Amino acid sequence: MKKLFIGIDFSKEKLDATIILACGMNEIGSREYGCFPNNTTGYRKLCNWVKTNAWNTIAEEWLFCGEDTGSCSIGLSKWLYGKGYDIWIENAYAIKHSSGIQRVKNDKADSAIIAEYAWRQQDKVVPFEPLNESLAQLREIFLYRHKLVGQRVAMELRKEDKSQSNKSKAISFINRKSKHLIAEINKTIAECDKAIDSIIEADEELKENYAIITSIKGVARQNATCMLVYTNNFKKFGYDPRKIACYYGVAPFGKQSGTSVNTPAHTSHFANKLIKSLLGQAAHIAKIYNPEIRDYYQRLISKGKKPQVALNNVKNKLIRIIVALVRKKAVSYTHLRAHETLANL
């Protein structure tokens, strides 16, 4: 059982930390607060400070906890993991909505809230584990490619908008430069695709699962890469399609309370919108070119389902098929009814 809880509030330049010593649900001793730079030197100072204020506890009884803030939190998380310490990186929304009424808002107070969250919710701890090197590289290139696509769209829209306005030397200059930039972006996107293929090809486990995912008509490179990255090659959610669907934001949930609240099931806005949009594109393609998915979609429409509801069912179906095939290490997806376990997904 953990006895020492260290809550860390991450920011770009510093780390605010609060220590709570507890035995069961009883807090022992006074809370300690410290502030450290968010770099390797600061990480060492943080650990030395914790050791100084550890009250005779051992490292196995410590639990570091912080909010998932991306680049601000990943450095310390990896450093502590490498040193053998337990660190829990939790969703910021979960911490905020479990802290009760708060009147004070500053970094010191936030670190105390995080430490208290780790103490009160220690039975729900999910220890931090970094992505392996291949997945980490895949994630960076995938996100970089996504940014490039956004920039290309913005550039094309601006170019099209200017082309429709009055002709002038300035407009000609903008169009000429826009064409050049769009061509360069397209070239870089193609290089990103090659890099993604190269990383997957070099990792046997990624290569195997990637081949399984892309064997499904409608699911291509970007959706397969996205699913591998955000599910940690399906290990993050324990091969549970319902959990993955929740993360994608396609799992429906209803609301019921007493006699006045009875809302039909619908998808939640708590989702990763990037990967949800990619899955939506896959579903659109699958319902056109994948015979089994097309029949499934038409069957739902014939039963009176609205097109968007039927399309969301297709998204869920794709996730369930992918997870089942990966879990069973099927060589490829050829026909839904060829696999009895998939027929009722």
Which role fits each region the language model picked out?
Residues 92-211:
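Long, charge-rich intrinsically disordered scaffolds of nucleic-acid metabolism proteins
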Residues 65-75:
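Acidic, metal-coordinating catalytic cores used for nucleic-acid/nucleotide bond scission
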Residues 215, 221, 227-303, 307:
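Phosphate-backbone recognition surface of nucleic-acid-processing proteins
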